[in-house]
Amino acid sequence: MPKMKTHRGSAKRFKKTASGKLKRGHAYTSHLFANKTKKQKRHLRKAALVSPGDFKRIRQMLDNLK
């Protein structure tokens, strides 16, 4: 059986932390900032962790990622 390949689109969007969790960026950050509040824009700048419900599925796509 051939080796599993890392999903390259996911590899660009997620980073592993030292404890093994996955960091992700927020959505809604590419344009239309005039319609968003300062608070909303400030919170969108911070990275977030992948939720436990999605973790297993994303980890399978990133199996070979270091």
Swiss-Prot record:
Residues 1-26 have a biased composition (Basic residues). GO terms for cellular component: cytosolic large ribosomal subunit. GO terms for molecular function: structural constituent of ribosome. The keyword Ribonucleoprotein applies. One of its GO terms (biological process) is translation. Residues 1-28 are annotated as: Disordered. InterPro entries: Ribosomal_bL35, Ribosomal_bL35-like, Ribosomal_bL35_CS, Ribosomal_bL35_sf. Disulfide bonds: none annotated. Pfam families: Ribosomal_L35p (PF01632). Keywords: Ribonucleoprotein, Ribosomal protein. HAMAP family: Ribosomal_bL35. Belongs to the bacterial ribosomal protein bL35 family. This is Large ribosomal subunit protein bL35.
